[in-house]
């Protein structure tokens, strides 16, 4: 029985679990991508693996791109300063 549990756990680790999140996509220096149109944000987001994206007007960081179902390996805006 223990072998079955260990093998199941090993298979889970080997296959990996990929998750997604909705967030402001960020540049490497923790700065958002400012925007004016939904089309530009949708292209930026989908090019980075998200399902879609749009320009969030008047949000927390001004007019910035918000991505829906963005992969975990793509940087997002986190609390703290933008380091330009």
Swiss-Prot record:
Tissue-specific expression: Expressed by the venom gland.
Propeptide feature: residues: 84
Domain LCN-type CS-alpha/beta: 21-83
Molecular function as annotated in GO: sodium channel inhibitor activity; toxin activity
PROSITE patterns: LCN_CSAB
A GO cellular-component term linked to this record: extracellular region
One GO BP: defense response
Subcellular location: Secreted
Cystine crosslinks: 31-82, 35-55, 41-65, 45-67
Keywords in alphabetical order: Disulfide bond, Ion channel impairing toxin, Neurotoxin, Secreted, Signal, Toxin, Voltage-gated sodium channel impairing toxin
Signal peptide coordinates: 1-19
Pfam family of the protein (one): Toxin_3
Biological function: Alpha toxins bind voltage-independently at site-3 of sodium channels (Nav) and inhibit the inactivation of the activated channels, thereby blocking neuronal transmission. This recombinant toxin selectively inhibits the fast inactivation of mNav1.4/SCN4A (EC(50)=82.3 nM) (tested in HEK293 cells).
UniProt note: domains: Has the structural arrangement of an alpha-helix connected to antiparallel beta-sheets by disulfide bonds (CS-alpha/beta).
Additional information: Negative results: does not inhibit rNav1.2/SCN2A (EC(50) is >30000 nM) channels.
Family according to the record: Belongs to the long (4 C-C) scorpion toxin superfamily. Sodium channel inhibitor family. Alpha subfamily.
Protein name: Neurotoxin BmK-M11
């Amino acid at each position: 029985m223990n072998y079955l549990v260990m093998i199941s756990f090993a298979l889970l680790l080997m296959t990996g679990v990929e998750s997604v999140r909705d967030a402001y996509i960020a540049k490497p220096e923790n700065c958002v991508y400012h925007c004016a149109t939904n089309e530009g944000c949708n292209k930026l987001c989908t090019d980075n693996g998200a399902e879609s994206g749009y320009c969030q007007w008047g949000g927390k960081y001004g007019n910035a791109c918000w991505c829906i179902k963005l992969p975990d390996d793509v940087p997002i805006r986190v609390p703290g300063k933008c380091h330009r």
